[in-house]
Amino acid sequence: DKISFALNQRLPEDIVVQGSCEVPADWHPRYQNSRKTYEYRILNRTFRMPTRRLDTYFYHHSLDVEKMSRAAVYLEGESFCAVNAQVKTTVRTIYACSVTKADDIITIRVTGNGFLYNMVRIIAGTLIQVGGGQIEPEQIEQILAARDREAAGPTAPAHGLTMMGIEYMEEKDIDTQGVV
C-alpha cells in the first residue's frame, strides 16, 4: 500500500498506518466509528521501572484489583459528564470495562461508542481510588447518578493511556477490514 508506506515515512515511531482505503468525501473517521477501545496501564509496585515510564502510570500504593473489577462493571451502560459540557451530547455508552493484573501491571480496558474529553482517564482515576480503598465499588452507581464531574475521582495522568483500536460501522462502499 503506497499511501501507508508514504505516511509511515513521515510519522513518529509510535504511530503506524497499517492500511488505507478510499472513502466517500463526506465520510469522517471520528464521527462514523461505532466502537473505540482504550487501555490504561498502571505499574503497581514498590519501585519505578524506567523501561515502562512512557506507557504506564507508576503507582506504588497497593491496589485491590478485585474491588476495581467489581466497580468496573457498574461503568458498563450509559455514562454522562457535567451538564455544562461543550459537546452536542454528553451521553456515551460503555460496552465493556474490565480490570486485569499480570505481574505488576494492572490494565483497565474500556470499550465504548465514544468518549468525552478525559473520560477514560477519569474512569482510571476513579478505579484507582476504588483499588486504594477511598471509594467502595458500589459507590460508582451514585457517582454516575450525580452527573457531576466533581463526584468522580481525579483525572489519571495521560502516559498510562493507549488507544487500542477503532471499529467502524459497516459501509457498503468502504472496506474497513484491518483498519485501525
Name what the model sees in each region.
Residues D1-V180:
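Structured-RNA-binding interfaces characteristic of tRNA pseudouridine synthases
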